[in-house]
């Protein structure tokens, strides 16, 4: 079924690209970013819609027939879809704003964060009894729910900030999820559909992922590590998303308090681009870093009693 998922994703993403071009759904590009990105203006965006749909179309028949795990897998899948909807609203606003030349450009952080946190709280409430262990045993179940929710929101935003270069987030996500393939069918399905997506997202990308895809990825990664492994291993495997979101936070705090920027541009992948690294070098080097970190996680999982 993983091959079916990959092929279905490949087909739906290709269909999405053709439909997007016919309707003029394109990605606006920041003029203050790397000049090499200007050629990407108008590239179809929100391609995550296609691979998330492919994942759902394969998962639910498998689940209903008893071949996709139990309630933990259903919880991860539903959370990924809910987070994907939040990101999808953002994608839709961006596309509509570009096509009309006016209107609301995107969800503001103060609008997006409460929606993310609401989804995360529902997940945390249901996941806490199913998790492999309490995050901090001495704090009790209520704080465990709060911490799980914060991890979920942090993961969604960290993976979202990792997007922006051709193939970067898809490759990073596949590597991060590798240790959990045998444990979590949803993680395995996500890896499969991302392979289908990367066929078109590899440099030079014919489609961008958008927020729906990145939100779903962050939700699956957090859900799988919380329910099957050790949540504290997630920031090790996902070191690139962690650094990406930290670079944004540091940049904002520095500019607001000191009036100075630490990085040429944030998230940090764009800093390296503006420092002279070719886009493909940044992507592959970030994959390598993720692979080394995930190998350490794999070893730590194997060493657990």
Swiss-Prot record:
Species for this entry: Deinococcus deserti (strain DSM 17065 / CIP 109153 / LMG 22923 / VCD115)
HAMAP family the UniProt entry points to: MraY (MF_00038)
Function: Catalyzes the initial step of the lipid cycle reactions in the biosynthesis of the cell wall peptidoglycan: transfers peptidoglycan precursor phospho-MurNAc-pentapeptide from UDP-MurNAc-pentapeptide onto the lipid carrier undecaprenyl phosphate, yielding undecaprenyl-pyrophosphoryl-MurNAc-pentapeptide, known as lipid I.
GO biological process, one term: peptidoglycan biosynthetic process
Pfam families per UniProt: Glycos_transf_4
Cellular component, GO annotation: plasma membrane
Name of the protein described by the UniProt record: Phospho-N-acetylmuramoyl-pentapeptide-transferase
Keyword Aminoacyl-tRNA synthetase: no
InterPro entries for this protein: Glycosyl_transferase_4, PNAcMuramoyl-5peptid_Trfase, PNAcMuramoyl-5peptid_Trfase_CS
